[in-house]
Amino acid sequence: MAQVAMSALPAEDEESSESRMVVTFLMSALESMCKELAKSKAEVACIAVYETDVFVVGTERGRAFVNTRKDFQKDFVKYCVEEEEKAAEMHKMKCTTQANRMSVDAVEIETLRKTVEDYFCFCYGKALGKSTVVPVPYEKMLRDQSAVAVQGLPEGVAFKHPEHYDLATLKWILENKAGISFIIKRPFLEPKKHLGGRVMAADADRPMLSPGGSCGPIKVKTEPTEDSGISLEMAAVTVKEESEDPDYYQYNIQGSHHSSEGNEGAEVEVPAEDSTQHVPSETSEDPEVEVTIEDDDYSPPTKRPKSSEPPPPPPVPEPTNAGKRKVREFNFEKWNARITDLRKQVEELFERKYAQAIKAKGPVTIPYPLFQSHVEDLYVEGLPEGIPFRRPSTYGIPRLERILLAKERIRFVIKKHELLNSTREDLQLDKPASGVKEEWYARITKLRKMVDQLFCKKFAEALGSTEAKAVPYQKFEAYPNDLYVEGLPENIPFRSPSWYGIPRLEKIIQVGNRIKFVIKRPELLTHSTTEVTQPRTNTPVKEDWNVRITKLRKQVEEIFNLKFAQALGLTEAVKVPYPVFESNPEFLYVEGLPEGIPFRSPTWFGIPRLERIVRGSNKIKFVVKKPELVVSYLPPGMASKINTKALQSPKRPRSPGSNSKVPEIEVTVEGPNNNSPQTSTVRTPTQTNGSNVPFKPRGREFSFEAWNAKITDLKQKVENLFNEKCGEALGLKQAVKVPFALFESFPEDFYVEGLPEGVPFRRPSTFGIPRLEKILRNKAKIKFIIKKPEMFETAIKESTSSKSPPRKTNSSPSVNTTASGVEDLNIIQVTIPDDDNERLSKVEKARQLREQVNDLFSRKFGEAIGMGFPVKVPYRKITINPGCVVVDGMPPGVSFKAPSYLEISSMRRILDSAEFIKFTVIRPFPGLVINNQLVDQNESEGPVIQESAEASQLEVPATEEIKETDGSSQIKQEPDPTW
């Protein structure tokens, strides 16, 4: 706390010491409050006048600011003297009306002067490139008038401190303040550069102060009054600053002691007659410069070395004065190291608090988008005021420090734990809010297109061409020394525009004129073209890749089989029934897999994941809580060992009742000739052997009859399930046939809840085996919502009255034909009235839209991989390998999926924005290479490729039939229904 002893104020000898003690005590309390505010990064400055004492209290920056504003202190003391004198005068004598009017004028002049002074400070800050108020150095400007020019003042009025203007001038300045501006021409010169010896002497007499020391005497000139015995002499005022508070900097950050004392100079010493600084250095008088300057020097004033550094040579030749000026450059490395360390600390803090909230012991990942989407059910308490909860990478250094200071108070509040089970796909732009997100998507799409056009143009210029050419981004990443780009903004690497966000895209466009492509080895680009357009020339690489991935898959398969056998207590390896594990994750699962790798068949994995599994094979462990689920999938010899060792009842697995507990995969085992339940019961041992057929290694012969019987049975089961749920929604006990056309035409009034993720509501005849099995596993959650029962009943009556006699039979589901759904549509199309014809036209329109979208995607994908013709899109491969293929230009709210997953409205929007859609192959994946090779081998069989592209709308079966017609020798993999 700084205390100023001054004789300017009238002293009363009768004043009791108690009153002085009370004031001192209260100022100490105010000082403590300032320290607490400083810990929260708030800045305070306070000047108190009590009789003969002046107190300066506040935070470090607040005191520094007040100490630099000597005129402010002088005005405040002068104001207090005048106010006390006015109060005494008013108390002793009654003022006349004229005196009152004069008092009002004085107050008005004082107010106008303060307003003009604030506006001058604003204009000076604006001239320095700041949007905040910066104190005007009046003495320097008057001493060195050519350094800063002031425009817009009235003719004949020179620039000076507002206290020297009269009332008319003040009013004119405020009325025409829009025309007033400050122009900084050069930095201020040293006092000895001027000829005025008087000024030099005055400046020399004014001592330089250390931040923690005492200020020199302040000359305060007071106005004389009738009753005050104060003369016109200058009263000496001594200002004492309080010492630095070491506790304020008790929070130590790693790497905070390795810095210079530049910040100290920026905060305290700048205003102390430092006339040698550059113009940018003047901005350090503004408290907001703390954001930039503080990030450069990282230690508190009390812990900084006291050595001064000579500044770099300024634009104007000046003699160096190492004791007075501290000019330095921004140290990016130091700032980057500090902010990276702080963000890491905050990230670890958030993860630790989040783990405590969900009671998790291991490492956790915070779903930040979920917290932003469900602010009422998921939020964080205890964050400093004004700081929202976001990723630490979005905070700057001040906020990161405040968060760490408040780490004990931070707490994650999770009201609905079920929200944490949501997948990341739920948070994408599937259902964006209208307005902001659509505007953002349109903006980023436009910017990416502009940057892509810019890159193509610059790339063509580097090749000596005037026409834009597509940029081979992969080659630039592969050969950074021979192919690179100059002129990009700082810290922005050269990549495909689809990698950039809006800020980087805007920066690239701003510097578009200076961007230059450097191509030292043009033959690399020629080689790239041949690689893309003629993949057959690179067959040795593909063969090496095929050999490598085949070997790794076989190795992982052997590891899984061995670990599975160990879990069952067997010594010999046993084939793992992967679908059974997928269907029963509660009783059958695998522990110890590398992070981020789910348990699936090795044929799903690429080389990186296979290698990670092999490296961590020692940690892998199979957990089989219910062996009876897998017994039926083991060879007879192995099954008997399991029966004697693992199970309590030996005969249980061989009974027909136990087989009913096995998931619906058992349908695959039943041959198409098993028409009666008795036959299936008798052939139970045969089924046990045959049940291993779907899980044999790839390359075995695919049984179309078994697949056909299974998918037919599953479709019938799902249709019966839908009919039962529809009847329940109407409050009926019997099943009601679902009018699918009504659900498609009025999705707001008729819809279905509880379907598995990614499975739309459609006719069961359009689904493949995976979706049918998902629906049956999720049947308990499925619920039909019918908001208009009267419309529903009318549609049912019209449908039943117009159709031929019911076709319901009590025969076994396995007797149904294979393509019954399609045949039914054809029959109904001939026999039903006009209303149903309209419904069927919608179904036909949806089919046509799917074909058009599929053709569009195939054409764009073919362009992306360098083909001159459409290529079938591997939707499943793109989905399970995120980041390999990026699809830009999709409409807002529509994510990239197979056309069979898309709604009609989404497909129409995709076709409307067809010209903006673009596939970008970031890195190849196994399916992409195999697909290219497959297309090359079948170039002469154009119709076959076209058929497969058209058939993708109905999902798997059609594709599998086409592949099957080529002979079983070409089938190297399991049937992949959704590829």
From Swiss-Prot:
Tell me which Gene Ontology terms the entry assigns under biological process: negative regulation of angiogenesis; negative regulation of cytosolic calcium ion concentration; positive regulation of transcription by RNA polymerase II; transcription by RNA polymerase II
Asked whether the keyword S-adenosyl-L-methionine is assigned, the reply is no
Q: How is it modified after translation?
A: Transiently phosphorylated on tyrosine residues by BTK in response to B-cell receptor stimulation. Phosphorylation on Tyr-248 and Tyr-379, and perhaps, on Tyr-484 contributes to BTK-mediated transcriptional activation.
Question: Where is motif Nuclear localization signal found?
Answer: 300-307
Q: Which Gene3D superfamilies match?
A: GTF2I-like
Where are stretches of biased composition, namely Polar residues?
Answer: 671-692
- Residues bearing N-acetylalanine are 2
Q: Name one GO cellular component term.
A: nucleus
Give the quaternary structure. Homodimer (Potential). Interacts with SRF and PHOX1. Binds a pyrimidine-rich initiator (Inr) and a recognition site (E-box) for upstream stimulatory factor 1 (USF1). Associates with the PH domain of Bruton's tyrosine kinase (BTK). May be a component of a BHC histone deacetylase complex that contains HDAC1, HDAC2, HMG20B/BRAF35, KDM1A, RCOR1/CoREST, PHF21A/BHC80, ZMYM2, ZNF217, ZMYM3, GSE1 and GTF2I. Interacts with BTK and ARID3A. Interacts with isoform beta of PRKG1.
Recorded protein name is General transcription factor II-I
- Which species is this UniProt entry from? Rattus norvegicus
